[in-house]
């Protein structure tokens, strides 16, 4: 059975994508952003450095929330074993691929900690032509909602999906299902590899629980100020929603 969304404070709804190649660079970013960011996503690049769990431990010691974004996809027994071990760490979110119902159910049954599992639906870098090339001649939103419902039925706690689909997902799944939206672009589209993007406020108005932001903060002339500006947008959107 899916668990209720994490009880996130307003300042914990911004997740910074810590897409750097080393422990030292990761911690430098955490120190640089200070109190402006309380939640960090760590993904594949840090895994390849061999320092992944050192970073995870360092974040936990700084009282930061951690999102493990490794998009697990394997046979059910292998994924279940991985989730069982990972649930022993101080992790708030973890991603698994949303393509296999049996694997999702096994992952959900193995998750005995407070970690929330998020199913990957359709990557925000993909559009309809990419789906067609994979033999799926449907609109991304339809595929995403279908996978969100399948994930919930399997006991997964939520999804990671484009903000463009936050509204349809929320209407389909109801309030007790986590929606985390990556590819957020505070100033609008910027012509990078993200295709299905939305702004900060729109994601929350449409039902997101949290957003993931990377380059708009990392490439800003003043990253902490950029994060603070996003936090202000989040607070305003939550007030508009009555949260």
UniProtKB/Swiss-Prot annotation:
Binding site for substrate: 19, 41, 69-78, 124, 185, 194, 214-215
Any Gene Ontology CC annotation: cytosol
Keywords, ordered alphabetically: Decarboxylase, Lyase, Pyrimidine biosynthesis
HAMAP family for the chain: OMPdecase_type1_B
Family statement: Belongs to the OMP decarboxylase family. Type 1 subfamily.
Cited function: Catalyzes the decarboxylation of orotidine 5'-monophosphate (OMP) to uridine 5'-monophosphate (UMP).
Subunit note: Homodimer.
Name under which the protein is recorded: Orotidine 5'-phosphate decarboxylase
Native source species: Xanthomonas axonopodis pv. citri (strain 306)
């Amino acid at each position: 059975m899916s668990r209720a969304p994490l009880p996130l404070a307003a300042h914990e709804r911004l997740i910074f994508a810590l897409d750097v190649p080393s422990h030292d660079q990761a911690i430098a970013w955490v120190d640089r952003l200070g109190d402006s960011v309380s939640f960090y996503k760590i993904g594949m690049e840090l895994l390849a450095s061999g320092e992944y769990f050192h970073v995870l431990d360092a974040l936990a010691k700084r009282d930061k929330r951690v999102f493990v974004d490794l998009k697990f996809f394997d046979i059910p027994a292998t994924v279940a074993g991985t989730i069982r071990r990972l649930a022993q760490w101080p992790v708030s979110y973890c991603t698994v691929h949303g393509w296999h119902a049996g694997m999702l159910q096994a992952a959900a049954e193995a998750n005995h900690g407070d970690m929330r599992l998020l199913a990957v639906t359709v990557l925000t870098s993909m559009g309809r032509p990419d789906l067609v090339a994979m033999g799926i001649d449907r609109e991304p939103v339809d595929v995403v909602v279908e996978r969100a419902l399948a994930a919930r039925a399997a006991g997964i706690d939520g999804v990671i999906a484009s903000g463009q689909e936050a509204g349809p997902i929320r209407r389909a799944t109801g309030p007790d299902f986590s929606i985390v939206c990556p590819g957020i672009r505070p100033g609008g589209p910027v012509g990078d590899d993200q295709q299905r993007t939305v702004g900060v406020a729109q994601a929350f108005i449409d039902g997101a629980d949290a957003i993931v932001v990377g380059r708009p903060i990392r490439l800003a002339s003043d990253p902490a100020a950029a994060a603070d500006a996003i936090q202000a947008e989040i607070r305003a959107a939550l007030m508009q929603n009555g949260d």
